[in-house]
Design a protein with these regions (language model features):
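Solvent-exposed coil/turn segments that connect beta secondary-structure elements
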Residues: 10-14, 20-22, 31-37, 54-59, ...
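Buried hydrophobic packing residues in well-ordered domains
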Residues: 12, 30, 48-50, 70, ...
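M16/MPP (pitrilysin/insulinase) zinc-metallopeptidase core fold and M16-derived inactive scaffolds
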Residues: 27-94, 135, 157-159
Length: 208
């Protein structure tokens, strides 16, 4: 493991910083404990929909403005739900550190969950599941292989959910999942790249 610093912010968030000065970039990953295992049994895919909406507008920025801020800086920003955690990852130029931290803090603490974006994302995810079932056989294994191994255990449900379960998910479900499962004490933030560990820690503490 490269040299790193570890600290705990006043709000309980764990912060890991790995300075690396050879390239003018900063990469980040935010890990929030509780991914699809926290989905209600009748609504697999709720964590995945919630995670997907984190990059569809936050704080003062709607989805277009959020994407424009990321792309305008030549950065990347993605969010997804795994079995045990929701992960938000990205990379920006070191000179855009303040923007990067601001976008991340907005996404995690002030997501908009706009109704139109929810409807659009849910529809797209359902269409993707339909297409996967109609594609090559590996798509079927990806969707249903875990069910054969874990049965009705939460591990047996694909993080993506099913056509039926996604259709049953409402925006209120997303809001409820967010308030029940997102919290500073469940969050680990990891930064690596062209950073000063002390300065970054101060900036993250202010933002979060």
């Amino acid at each position: 493991v490269p040299p790193y610093t570890r600290s705990v912010l006043p709000n309980g968030t764990v912060l890991l910083v790995m300075p690396r000065k050879d390239v003018p970039l900063i990469a980040f990953t935010a890990l929030l404990r509780g991914g699809s295992v926290a989905d209600p049994q009748s609504k697999p895919g709720l964590a995945s929909i919630t995670a997907g909406l984190l990059e569809k507008g936050a704080g003062a920025r709607d989805a277009f403005a959020f994407a424009d801020a990321v792309e305008g800086a030549g950065g990347s920003f993605t969010a997804a739900a795994g079995t045990e955690a929701i992960t938000v990852s990205g990379q920006f130029l070191a000179k855009d550190q303040e923007l990067m931290i601001g976008l991340l803090a907005d996404a995690l603490e002030r997501p908009r969950f706009d109704a139109a974006e929810f409807d659009s994302l849910r529809k797209r995810r359902i269409e993707e599941l339909k297409a996967a079932k109609d594609s090559d056989p590996s798509g079927l294994i990806r969707l249903y292989g875990r069910r054969f191994l874990f049965g009705d255990h939460p591990y047996g449900s694909p993080s993506s959910g099913s056509e039926r379960s996604l259709a049953a998910i409402s925006r209120d479900d997303v809001l409820g999942f967010y308030h029940a499962n997102f919290g500073a004490d469940r969050l680990t933030l990891i930064f690596a790249g062209d950073v000063d560990a002390a300065a970054l820690t101060q900036a993250v503490t202010r933002a979060f």
